[in-house]
């Protein structure tokens, strides 16, 4: 029902004898709508009704997701609900509906503080369009409840974001650990074979990556070592983002009373990341879900992202 000030003014002017066309043109009001409104009877009522939806079931499913993954925002909650709906053969839930329900029930995460832009311009692109073109690697450490420190080295594919291999140790970041991760990544993607064309191995300038033994071993496996610019963490942004994700969504909430327990739970975290963690660059699919979808459809990575 029209209740705007312009419409009310137009009706008043027409009631005083002004022409409908002149009033609609001067006030920029739809003449057709004025024509309909003026011919309504006094007892006219708007028969339209807002759609009432029962959100109880969706709210229960949302609580189930955030009960297990409390650091997930509404987009990743929606992605997991969508995946479950696809498995059950049910209609997918709209992301805006998930946002509305979570907002009404105070389940949204707090907004992150604004990050000041970097003064150093970064014009390159770390992500690639096809799998097995570029892999990236980095490391991080975290502390257990008993004070024991674990150091993790990992490798990711810069297209499908799958964690190819990882290693955890109580020692430092060394060349032997990096070589183990390299070998595990190659075996993960190529089995007992070597890449038919060199795969870029993108890392920072840590001594374990720049060591001659590491670089020689990389070339033996069909990898081409590439190092980022000095003091440019954004040049290895995919690996840096993964560190933030694994610490925020997994390490911060998993039990880690000692190193052995933490290592076991970390293995489950990497498996959950590969199999279930929705990634925005993959259309909010998990890395392995994205790979399965691509293999099933027989499509390239670019076309797969459009589906």
Swiss-Prot record:
Keywords from the named record: DNA recombination, DNA-binding, Transposable element, Transposition
InterPro entries: HTH-like_dom, Integrase_cat-core, RNaseH-like_sf, RNaseH_sf, Transpos_IS3
Secretion signal span: none
Keyword Glycoprotein: no
Sequence ranges assigned to domain Integrase catalytic in this UniProt record: 112-295
Function: Involved in the transposition of the insertion sequence IS2.
Species for this entry: Escherichia coli (strain K12)
GO annotation, biological process: DNA integration; DNA recombination; transposition
GO MF term list: DNA binding
Protein name: Transposase InsD for insertion element IS2-9
